[in-house]
Design a protein with these regions (language model features):
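Scaffold/interface architecture of coatomer-like assemblies
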Residues: 1-300
């Protein structure tokens, strides 16, 4: 909503009212780490590949971007560079064909020919008591966001720092846990923006994906990251919708009310809650619920 001024806002840190020292409605240049899930199903991956030029086009000449991809591992494709100077070669390096079908089937009626319950192609078929299991899949979303956040934390503080994730949101096999990643994000004032694709774009499947099944990882955790960092997420299924989401999300990230206050210096790294209120009726506020102070030696 446009037209709000400093007097329309009240900010509380740990319940204590704060005096605003900074207020702006001007658009901010963006530092964006673009994180792409390249282990999506082949059909979805094809759509994402085709939309990558539109993603780059959603940024301005004042923005900078870095590219990352992940599946069972994380890889930085390019470091931070001006968005308009991002090379075609870098975009091509992020493209993948995606996975075909579902996870491998190692047993049951669809597991191929067997003798006494053992695959005829199994060199250990003569063994006793072995239980066929499917190879464990991994989708290291937490690790990907953590790597991007650490790199992004070193960028200029005067820029708006965001991680732009394109994924179905599944998490399995990361070394980093959710709470660890969240702490790094909040300590470095980084917001997560996301385009949910594939099952994350289908409401009934998306709801099921948010349930954790022991041994199978977590489904769509992107909404948690988005909510905890005051970002935004759009779920799109077709190519045109994905491309439109890119433009809407970057516009949202760039154009926000920016308010600031001077907090009390302390050596403590404990979480500090922040409550932002707008003194007008029927408005919903999107703001981070708090932050973790950086150690004095790392603050710039």
């Amino acid at each position: 909503m446009a037209g709000l001024g400093p007097s329309d806002f009240k900010v509380y840190e740990d319940g204590v009212p704060q005096q605003l020292k900074f207020f702006s409605v001007d658009p901010f240049p963006i530092s964006a780490a673009i994180v792409v899930d390249t282990d999506l199903p082949a059909g979805t991956m094809k759509k994402v590949n085709e939309t990558l030029p539109a993603l780059v086009g959603a940024f301005t000449e004042f923005d900078e971007v870095a590219l990352y991809r992940y599946g069972h591992t994380v890889q930085q494709i390019s470091g931070f560079t001006g968005a308009t100077g991002l090379s075609t070669a870098s975009l091509n390096r992020i493209k993948r064909t995606g996975r075909e079908g579902g996870p491998p089937v190692a047993g049951g009626p669809f597991g191929g020919p067997s003798i006494n319950g053992h695959s005829v192609n199994d060199p250990n078929a003569g063994g006793q008591g072995d239980v066929p299991t499917a190879p464990k899949e991994s989708y290291v979303l937490n690790d990907a966001i953590l790597l991007a956040a650490r790199d992004l934390g070193r960028r200029d503080k005067t820029r708006r720092r965001i991680i732009f994730v394109i994924s179905d949101g599944r998490e399995q096999g990361s070394n980093a846990g959710y709470d660890e990643v969240k702490r790094i994000l909040l300590a470095n004032d980084i917001s997560i923006y996301a385009v949910g694709v594939d099952t994350a774009a289908i409401p009934i499947y998306d709801q099921a994906n948010r349930i954790r099944v022991p041994g199978f990882g977590t489904g769509n955790i992107l909404p948690r990251y988005v909510s905890d960092t005051a970002g935004d997420m759009m779920a799109e299924f077709d190519r045109q919708g994905i491309e439109q989401a890119y433009a809407k999300i970057t516009d949202t990230a760039r154009n926000q009310y920016t308010i600031g206050y001077t907090t009390q210096a302390t050596k403590s790294s404990a979480f500090r809650s922040v409550d932002v209120r707008v003194l007008r009726p029927n408005l919903k506020v999107y703001a981070k619920e708090g932050y973790y102070p950086l150690p004095p030696s790392t603050q710039k």
